Amino acid sequence: MEMVTLGKTGITVNKNGFGALPIQRISIDDAVALARRAYEAGMTFFDTARFYTDSEEKLGEAFDGMREKVCIATKTAAQNAEDFWKDLGVSLHNLRTDYIDIYQFHNPSFCPKPGDGTGLYEAMLEAKAQGKIRHIGITNHRLAVANEAIDSGLYETLQFPFCYLATEKDLELVKKCKEADMGFIAMKALSGGLINNSAAAYAFEAQYDNVLPIWGVQRKSELEEFISYIDNPPVMNDEIKALIEHDRKELSGEFCRGCGYCMPCPAGIEINNCARMSLMLRRAPSDAQLTPEMQAKMKKIENCLHCNKCKSKCPYGLDTPTLLQKNYEDYKHVLAGEVSVR
């Protein structure tokens, strides 16, 4: 069983983390069963967020009475100290616990620091002094903020998108975290569903002994796939290298990662799915993307207000309105049978 230590936190867990964002989409009974199955199989790191609707409550139900056996990380998107304390209180209540193992600032547009006027980092320190949190972390999608967080020495963990589509700058973050004795938690290890070979994804992550990937699962079949890697971890070989190289070529350039930070859209467009529809049609069974329900969602692109709010919020600097239009045009051609994706 491969283990990973999250830097100076000293937290050592199985090198398969459980990303609890997707369980907000399933029933509480199914979510509890999934989380408990993960634990029974050896997973002990569970990552959630106040922003993930009822995800925290489901983990709270799953691990009620066995808190010391799991490591729970959650997040706050608070912009000020008052909201920080509100979020922390709700999270503790939902998770049925009196402490959070790793409390993370959730994708802030800046790196919270003492004296920056927000009171956020000071609140973190006070929460830690009170024993309500044990370690301070930050999550982000922006290289500049991530680098600043590492360089500041203020954080014990960084959660950042990291998969086999990573750039050299992403790889440098992993190296810097190791040098700083800072835990690195890899989100989007499957690039929001664009990577469809979990064995290749796992083999890539396994090359970095300081990286803890968190796999977002909502189906038992998905979970069992990752559980199988606990005792039989995939290793990098020529076949996997060739697959990764192929995907890097196909997915190079500007594409939507599906992070959802552009949401909600004032026109009701499901941007985080619609803006990457062309890729989803070609990298997964296309029938699921051509249902009447999905057609209705894509048609909403016609209602785009061109307010550019999504563009301004995108942590990857994408021209989201243009990307939506390109995906919609391609989608219409596929629907009309003018373009084959099979």
Over which residues does each language-model region extend?
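Short hydrophobic/aromatic-enriched beta-strand-loop microsegments
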Residues: 69-72, 155-163, 234-240
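Conserved, mostly hydrophobic/aromatic
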Residues: 6, 18, 46, 59, ...
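Structured C-terminal cap/extension of enzyme domains
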Residues: 43-44, 172-186, 190-342
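Conserved residues at the C-terminal ends of beta-strands
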Residues: 19, 49, 103-106, 139, ...
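N-terminal binding-site loop/beta-alpha segment at the start of enzyme catalytic domains
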Residues: 1-70
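Short catalytic-loop micro-motif centered on adjacent basic/acidic residues
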Residues: 44-50, 73-74, 134-137, 157-160, ...
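Glycine/proline-rich, positively charged
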Residues: 29, 36, 40, 79-185, ...
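A general structural detector for well-ordered alpha-helical segments in enzyme core domains, enriched
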Residues: 2, 34-35, 58-62, 87-91, ...
